[in-house]
Amino acid sequence: MERKVFSKDGKEIRTINLDDRVFNIEISHGSIYNAIKNELSNLRVGTSSTKTRSEVRGSSKKPWKQKGTGRARVGTRRNPVWIGGGIALGPKPRDYSYRLPKKVKRLAFKSVLSLRASDENNFKVIENFNIESGKTKDLALIIKNFASFNGKVVILLGNDDQMIKRAGKNIRDLKILSFDKLRVVDLFYAKNLIALESAVNKLNEFYVK
């Protein structure tokens, strides 16, 4: 699949080949769902904790005798029905993370890349560039040539360029991701995807294996 490559000024300069095995496969919505669920689950801290009836402070003495008072029978002030009692079936610290099969993860990445590449207006390939100044305004001028700021914008880099990342820190709804640190959830919810040539070449090379 051929796509136009633009300069950082927004001018068409050449074309690039997007490998059909990466950017034009049949989209597997199930694998995308499972990958996003896995990524979000792995981010959960899992520190929520409640006290059971055996852990809360208070006497374990029976408040009143079982029979003869006309009141409901109660065994302890710490029972979950009473205010200040323990919590029944409440959350405890746990690990929510789990491992997703590699084949499912690879299929999810290729599916979400194919989904984004299917919309030529919201997926742009641009020549490699540097921002030596590291200034936000310099990066913002480049982005305006390719995307509106009405939704999430993701820029894919071929390497971990700290100056470009520094320039994008103050831009709202912008994520700058290097090729080796992509997440399906970021690509899926991006309204505009801008990929540098180097990122496309590395994606072609990595996911064709």
Curated annotation (Swiss-Prot):
GO terms for molecular function: rRNA binding; structural constituent of ribosome. This is Large ribosomal subunit protein uL4. Residues 46-71 are annotated as: Disordered. One of its GO terms (biological process) is translation. Part of the 50S ribosomal subunit. Residues 59-71 have a biased composition (Basic residues). One of the primary rRNA binding proteins, this protein initially binds near the 5'-end of the 23S rRNA. It is important during the early stages of 50S assembly. It makes multiple contacts with different domains of the 23S rRNA in the assembled 50S subunit and ribosome. Belongs to the universal ribosomal protein uL4 family. It holds the Pfam family Ribosomal_L4. Keywords: Ribonucleoprotein, Ribosomal protein, RNA-binding, rRNA-binding. One of its GO terms (cellular component) is ribosome.
